[in-house]
């Protein structure tokens, strides 16, 4: 029901796509060896009905692959999961890497760089557009792989939900700092996180 409300809002406000996070099984075991299943929705998320409804309203769905930093688990499923999205008519994908990589590797390590390259190439084979969160720095890869639409790589306003937030100067500096390296996905606001309604 909530998914359809967001699709209706997007259609009414000329928003081209809606991102749904947390629809796939595995969130309750974050960080576990087999935590996320990238093709198995929770029982209350009917992916076929949601895609059908979105298409009827002229809105695209952006899929979400949060890895929690568990790269081996994601790479085992990546090709099949992207094909699964393609089969469902989903061609936009946000990847996420909130969490430590295995064996102490850092996001910007050679291990991380190689992984991101595999993701971009696999997505291209499946004609998927990518938005990477917790990415490596922009390297110009989108010149070779234009399906690499954007990456986060900045402290967005979601930080206002659990911390003192960002000062106003942070937001106005980003166009002159972070954006010099390429397109940026930025979280511009936070919904009511207290759930008072």
Where are these regions (language model features)?
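An acidic-aromatic substrate-binding cleft motif
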Residues: 1-8, 13, 17
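Aromatic- and carboxylate-enriched substrate-binding clefts and catalytic-loop regions
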Residues: 21-196
